[in-house]
Amino acid sequence: MGLFSRKRDHTPAVPKEKLIPCDKIFLDPPAKYGNAPLLEPISEDQNEKYRAVLRHFQDDDLKLPENLNDLDNGTHANDRPLSDWEKFWLSRECFLRYLRANKWNTANAIKGLTKTLVWRREIGLTHGKEDKDPLTADKVAVENETGKQVILGFDNAKRPLYYMKNGRQNTESSFRQVQELVYMMETATTVAPQGVEKITVLVDFKSYKEPGIITDKAPPISIARMCLNVMQDHYPERLAKCVLINIPWFAWAFLKMMYPFLDPATKAKAIFDEPFENHIEPSQLDALYNGLLDFKYKHEVYWPDMVKKVDDLRLKRFDRFLKFGGIVGLSEYDTKGQHDELKYPVDMVI
């Protein structure tokens, strides 16, 4: 559907006896979706550009500022080297994501990666002891007490499903809402299994009338633009598609205002007023949208379970990163896997 077209779905609900009770995140897509594919080869020219980016961040003398103001102003008083966690983030796939997002322009890819590394330091996402003010689950937990953002299930390409339910808004607009988006993006991308880099976002604008919900109105443009900049600048090539449903008139007006700020790649991935079931298998979809998962959000159950599972998963992959040398450019295929031997050495040409 086009951006300003509207379509209504009247598919009947799934019979109750077929529903699957669910109140927690799960980390494994169905086995029938297959094993992780091997890494796709790149051209000789692309490989040379990849290696140029790799060499830049392999430099032992590389030091970066702790905040974007210092980066923009060329201030180096508080520069520090890359931590092990930052090297873990700088995977082969990460380099390629930034290269693709920058149309294989090496200088722009390095600039984008540098900006994101500094931004991650500033917002508290390095996951190391050097984080002065880490972005923790406790810091944003109150934002999700009504379940307005949920990671649940996978599409048939094994991409995690990230639900955003604007009609379950429980807090006034603030920077903490941006922080929650960042925290949940980190969660969704961490949940992505071996061989998967992208996520699918499902946005529901339906108004819910429950205790704790204060509004179903769209956020202020300032907050929305901040969130959009986070997605486009710091999570490039992470969005597979974004499906939006139950869009009221005021949300259409909001989307029209935001549309000019979307980059062409993001615009191409937006799908308006199509049922989620057109894109997701029933066994992986919330029953609210004619799926089979009888999902009930209980904050005291879902939130701590999600935090522990994802923290444990991240640490497990970091331990594998250290096992395989702890160097810049290791493949996520190796850190996400179960195998004992390194399949993609940093200097390997694919």
UniProtKB/Swiss-Prot annotation:
InterPro entries in alphabetical order: CRAL-TRIO_dom (IPR001251), CRAL-TRIO_dom_sf (IPR036865), CRAL/TRIO_N_dom (IPR011074), CRAL/TRIO_N_dom_sf (IPR036273), PI_Transfer_CRAL-TRIO (IPR052578)
Keyword annotations: Cytoplasm, Endoplasmic reticulum, Lipid transport, Microsome, Transport
Protein's GO biological process: Golgi to plasma membrane protein transport; intermembrane phospholipid transfer; negative regulation of phosphatidylglycerol biosynthetic process; phosphatidylserine metabolic process; phospholipid biosynthetic process; phospholipid transport; positive regulation of phosphatidylcholine biosynthetic process; response to xenobiotic stimulus
GO terms, molecular function: phosphatidylinositol transfer activity; sterol binding
Subcellular location as annotated: Cytoplasm; Microsome
Top-level taxon of the source organism: Eukaryota
Pfam families (alphabetical): CRAL_TRIO, CRAL_TRIO_N
Reactions catalysed according to its record: a 1,2-diacyl-sn-glycero-3-phospho-(1D-myo-inositol)(in) = a 1,2-diacyl-sn-glycero-3-phospho-(1D-myo-inositol)(out)
Location of the CRAL-TRIO domain: 139-297
GO cellular component entries: cell periphery; cytoplasm; cytosol; endoplasmic reticulum; endosome; endosome membrane
Subunit details: Interacts with phosphatidylserine decarboxylase PSD2. Also interacts with PBI1.
Additional record remark: Present with 5040 molecules/cell in log phase SD medium.
Role this protein plays: Has phosphatidylinositol transfer activity. Involved in the regulation of the phospholipid composition of plasma- and endomembranes. Altering plasma membrane composition may provide a possible mechanism for multidrug resistance. Contributes to efficient phospholipase D1 activation and phospholipase B1 inhibition in the regulation of phospholipid turnover. Forms a complex with phosphatidylserine decarboxylase PSD2 that seems essential for maintenance of vacuolar phosphatidylethanolamine (PE) levels.
Official protein name in the record: Phosphatidylinositol transfer protein PDR17
Taxonomic source organism: Saccharomyces cerevisiae (strain ATCC 204508 / S288c) (Baker's yeast)
Gene name tied to this protein: PDR17
